[in-house]
Amino acid sequence: MIFATLEHILTHISFSIISIVITIQLIDLLVYQIVGICDSSEKGIIATFFCITGLLITRWIYSRHFPLSDLYESLMFLSWSFSIIHMVPKAGNHKNDLSAITGPSAIFTQGFATSDLLTEMHQSAILVPALQSQWLMMHVSMMLLSYAALLCGALLSVAFLVITFRKNTDIAVKSNYLLIGTFSFGEIQYLNEKRSVLQNTSFPSFRNYHRYRLTQRLDHWSYRVISLGFIFSTIGILSGAVWANEAWGSYWNWDPKETWAFITWTIFAIYLHTRTNQSLQGVNSSIVASIGFLIIWICYFGVNLLGIGLHSYGSFTLTAN
């Protein structure tokens, strides 16, 4: 009873803190450069990390198994993973471009985990025989860490595409205006003078330079985070194959979860391959990563919604009240 109450308290504290963090980030976005507001956001994420860590440890103690046996526990672990990814750039004293991704992702996953849809899973249950293995921690934790990293990397690629295509759209609109517009002599003289000034300087406009630097950072972090997630995914799939052989006598069975895990792994393997080709980097590789974003959600929620296959334990059904 004490552990259940403590878990309930930690759940609401962590959700409240992450909600405040999102609010702070929105204020920082709308009201530029408020002194100390960014530091408060970082401290909030750290506090959330410790709250979720305490929650998972508490559930581990009173359930007597690693808390990764159902969708509720996996969502809480996924939220915990997002908070870790958020803190990685800060530890290296890098500009944290991940904060706009990790914060909302953490609040979304934790909000869904604590919703009424998963009420039946809030109470820990005895593990089914197939899950009573030491491979549970290794396999499931690696897969969830890979989901968190791949989702963050894919969202960074989506942001890269949005900024890039928006820039191209602005250029196209301006080009059409120049082609179809009629100019007076004064307007033509002004454009010629402006072009002359731009040709005589070696620096692009501040706005274009800032946008260029932002897209480069997004592309850079997307590649690094996806590479990390791909490593976790590979380890998770291999450890899962070993566990499957021990539990069911076969390394691979092509059930829905395994099939979509393989598709996810293949998509991001293609992404990493495009990164080795200079001509395919940037937009092309980001498109592949964006496709991977959809594939991950199908892989993660698909089996739980269908409730079929060898990985159907921990699934949930939508029932009317």
UniProtKB/Swiss-Prot annotation:
Q: Which residues cross the membrane?
A: 17-37, 43-63, 143-163, 225-245, 258-275, 287-307
UniProt keyword Cell division, yes or no: no
Listed GO MF terms: heme binding
Q: Does the keyword Plastid apply?
A: yes
Q: Its GO biological process terms?
A: cytochrome complex assembly
Q: Which InterPro entries match?
A: Cyt_c_assembly, Cyt_c_biogenesis_CcsA, Cyt_c_biogenesis_CcsA/CcmC
Write out the annotated subcellular location.
Answer: Plastid, Chloroplast thylakoid membrane
Q: Which UniProt keywords apply?
A: Chloroplast, Cytochrome c-type biogenesis, Membrane, Plastid, Thylakoid, Transmembrane, Transmembrane helix
An annotated GO cellular component? plasma membrane
Q: How does it sit in the membrane?
A: Multi-pass membrane protein
**Main role?**
Required during biogenesis of c-type cytochromes (cytochrome c6 and cytochrome f) at the step of heme attachment.
Q: Which HAMAP family does the protein's record reference?
A: CytC_CcsA
Q: How does it assemble?
A: May interact with Ccs1.
Give the UniProt family note.
Answer: Belongs to the CcmF/CycK/Ccl1/NrfE/CcsA family.
Q: This protein is called what?
A: Cytochrome c biogenesis protein CcsA
Q: Which gene encodes it?
A: ccsA
